Every structure is written in C-alpha cells, then in structure tokens.
Amino acid sequence: MHNHEDKQLGGVGFDLGAGSGSEMSAESLALPVDELSHGAASQEAPVERHSVEDISDVRDFMLVAASSSERGARLGNEDCAWYGDDCACLSDGIGGAPFGDVMSRLCCGAFDKAWKSALDAVGDAAGRWALGEWCMYQAFVSVDAFVSKASSCLGEGSGATLVAVAACEGELVFGRMGDSTAYVLCDDGGLEHVFGNDRGRIRAGGNALRAAMGYHVLRNGGNAPLQTASMPMREGMKILLCSDGVWDQLPAARIAELLSLDGEPCTASRSIVLEAAEAGGERSDNATAVVIDVRRSEMPSGQQTPWISTW
C-alpha cells in the first residue's frame, strides 16, 4: 500500500508530489456539486508518484459490495452508506450537532457526482491511474463546498465524517475526513488500517473530531485535513468502510475474524454491525459497515458491471 498523505481543505495548497513543482489551491477546486465542470482539466497534472502492479487485467476484476447499519442505543441513525458504479462511501453525522442525519446523506449523495466529475476532468490521459489520489482530493473538496452551504443553513456545528473508496485503473483509491475509516483484510488474515494509527480525533480516547465535512470550527485554525491513500487492486481483497460505532467497539482482530469467516459481503457487514451494537450495550453508537470483495470476473470485459451491489 502506498503511504497515506494529509492534505488541507479550506484554501491551503495541495502539494501534488515531491519535485513536481506544482501546487493547486483548494479554492480553485472548491466547486459546488451542482456546478461541477471540467475546468480543472486545464490545470497542470501532477507527476507520476508511484507505480501500480499489473494493471493490464483491470477489466477482469469485479467488486461486490454490501452495507449494513444498526441504530444501537441512539434514538436515530445518523450514519449513511452508499455505493455506485465504481465508488463507495460512508458518512456519520456529528453527534450532538443539528441535522447530523441530513449532513451524512448529503455527503454520500454528493460524492458519486463529485468523483465522476473529477475523473472526467482528467480524461483518458495516459497514466490516469496515477492521478487517483488527486481526483479523490478534488471530489472531497467539491463535496465539502456543497455540504458547507447546507451547514450554514442548518445550524452552526452541523457536519459529518466521510470515508470513500474508488476503483481507478487497477488501483483502489481512498479518502477520509473525520473518524470514519477504512480497513483492508491482508493475505495473512491480519487487518490493515488504511490510514495508519490515526483515529481522526483530537485526543486519543476522546470523542472530539479533528475535522469533518462542512464543519470548519476546528481546533487547527479552520483547515480541515484530508487523508488519501491508494493501493493496487488484487483478487481476494476485502475492504471495510466503517463508522466509529464499529471500530470503537470491536478490536481489529475480531473485525478481521468476522471478515474472514463470512464469505459474502452482505453477511459479513451484518455480522460486524450487530456485534458492534451488542458490544456497546446501553451506550452503543450507530454502527455502519460497507464490505467490498475484489473478485475475478469470468464475464467478457465489455459486458462487465464494475460493482455488483447487494443488500
């Protein structure tokens, strides 16, 4: 896996790669979702920063996704999960803030269009896979601009986390803001946290978020850190996107075991959220999981559906 990097939303420049000499302002990318255009195609493209392992057979892959959610002990469920043709995301409304359920749904609803617009801006240029993290950054900035407008109407402090994964020319590209996160089940049965040991919170053991979509009253001066990561797509991979109601209650070893034991994404996602809600008892949070399997497809490449969504 390629090392994750932190970028900054909120007008701070995005370094496109060591030695590239290129920098793109977040302000130049912060387009409302309803007004996304292909204008970014005229910007200088980032240099290639890494190599992918065998992308020649990318069309032979099929991704099967499923999601489950449990309300837990909360009165309502402010989590939301979504997946589409080539991407999936999960969002969790900020606890205690107004309209958390609305904000999480806005984030998920906006991400698909934002991701596709970012890819369209790149076009079919050679080496498009190397621009995956750049496209993910663009998508997050666009979603943040959109939900920030909603947040200003819904009430001060409203916002949501967002974690996403997308397939891009043989790679899986991840993005994250807040404490929702992503894991990959390793070949040896261990669980790898895509974003390292960072929990997305200000203090270890605390609940306060370091950043959230649409929420810029932050401890770090108003700059919302976005994390991205990427890795080659491989047959047999299992990816988990989850809210803090999952990882805060279940140890990594148990999550890995549940992903390994339950063969289908639908049963694995259901087992994970049910056990997380039970582990939390009377104080359990909303728990949501999206499980994605990377499989080898036997269909001709021209007839494949990149993602098969199951519930």
What are these regions (language model features)?
Residues M1-W311:
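PP2C/PPM-type serine/threonine phosphatase catalytic domain
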